């Protein structure tokens, strides 16, 4: 699902909006994140399953992925592994409502960019996305 209101307008400088992908099986969480990013220069696409998110990543160049760890079917940790094999530089911000030290360490070992525990502060999420986009810019310049 693409949020066309966000994708219809370019940034103030006239350039394309940065594409971000949000994957969470909870429609309210997806909408909350889309709304939190509405004032940012991002075009936000959404997916409700990891498989759908992976397919989108294979077709579209994203600047960051916001991913729930607990998803039906293919789980978040497995999805991170697949995504990293396809695009190792894509910054992944994970969210979970089932936090534990072991889960956080597994996510960090898989190569995530940022770890959020639900419920989280939306300002923290927005700051993490901004940092992820800057990180992506730096890694692209070095490549």
Where are these regions (language model features)?
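Two-component/phosphorelay signaling modules centered on CheY-like receiver
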Residues: 27-45
